């Protein structure tokens, strides 16, 4: 699985974005999910605290592609768990750039995760 951090404003370096992508990707596991979920790409948004902790209640699905709504819900649940579990101690984000990453969009694609 792969995730892309979708909407982190320009001043963050490619390395900083990649660090967040890698951190979340380690926890993202669709496991033995349905075939439908395994072909579904979901875009997820999350609000972050200044210390790099995700605000769990803010995690929301913005949209999906490639599968059914049921498959998207399964993929979203896996994405939500990944953000919550790997973000338990905060993500490695530069505090001086908080205004740029306080709202993040991530694209979770079974073929690769990315930031947008």
Segments (PLM) and residue ranges:
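Short beta-strand
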Residues: 33-37, 97
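Short, small/polar residue-rich loop motifs at catalytic or cofactor-binding pockets
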Residues: 38-42
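A short, basic-hydrophobic beta/loop patch
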Residues: 77
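An anionic, turn-rich surface loop/hairpin at beta-sheet edges
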Residues: 67-73
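Conserved "boundary/linchpin" sites in short secondary-structure elements
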Residues: 4, 22-29, 48-66, 80-116
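Intrinsic-disorder/low-complexity signature in envelope-associated proteins
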Residues: 1-29, 33-34
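Short, surface-exposed charged micro-motifs
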Residues: 45
């Amino acid at each position: 699985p792969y995730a892309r951090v979708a909407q982190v404003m320009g001043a963050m370096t490619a390395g900083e974005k990649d660090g967040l992508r890698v951190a979340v990707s380690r926890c993202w596991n669709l496991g033995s999910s349905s075939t439908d979920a395994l072909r579904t790409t979901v875009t997820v948004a999350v609000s972050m605290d200044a210390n790099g902790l995700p605000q769990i209640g803010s995690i929301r699905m913005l949209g999906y592609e490639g599968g059914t709504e049921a498959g998207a819900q399964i993929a979203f649940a896996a994405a939500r768990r990944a953000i919550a579990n790997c973000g338990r101690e905060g993500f490695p984000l530069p505090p001086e750039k908080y205004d740029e990453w306080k709202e993040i969009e991530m694209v979770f694609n079974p073929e690769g995760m990315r930031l947008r």
